[in-house]
Amino acid sequence: MPDLSFSVDGAEAVSFAAAPLVSFKLRIRNANVSEQIQSILLRCQIQMETTKRRYSPKEQAQLFELFGEPERWGHTLRSMLWTHTSATVSPFQGETTVDMPVPCSFDFNIAATKYFAGLDDGVVPLNLMFSGTIFFETDDAGLQVEQISWDKEAPFKLPVSTWRDMMDHYYPNSAWLCLRRDVFER
């Protein structure tokens, strides 16, 4: 019976894609190193752990629209859902590393974009939460199916520069503009 653990070894912008992507290098380990994993249909929810970093006065001002006055951040600053993504993992034994693509754009998630854009530097603490289906061989060469336990998570500190470099690559010298509906309809 598989007992998987997950960690993130790094992240980088994908240079040649139809849409902006950040690729996370995901390491998957099975505690039973001799067990043959045939495939994993992996789902991942990524949360931005906004309370786990410090903010400069300039960043606090830039994040006002998301979190309000810094004096109220004890009540308004919360973890935010960034996105959901999925990946299919090929057969392995013991351990494997896979690329997990995460689509990004200015208009995909306005709150996430405002958050990333409001940071000058440093890292964005993330929590990747996994679920999905594992297909594995049994000792008698049968195939078993099992769900990934809901408690499987991996923290990662995404450099703000990774997101910024990706946006600069796909949207050079551009920014997303969010308009009120009445202004847009003119």
Give the location of each predicted region:
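Contiguous beta-strand segments within globular domains
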Residues: 15-28, 37-46, 104-106, 172
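Short aromatic-acidic-glycine turn motif
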Residues: 46-58
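Internal, hydrophobic beta-strand segments that form the core of beta-sheet-rich folds
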Residues: 43-49, 99-144
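Short beta-strand elements
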Residues: 61-70, 135-172
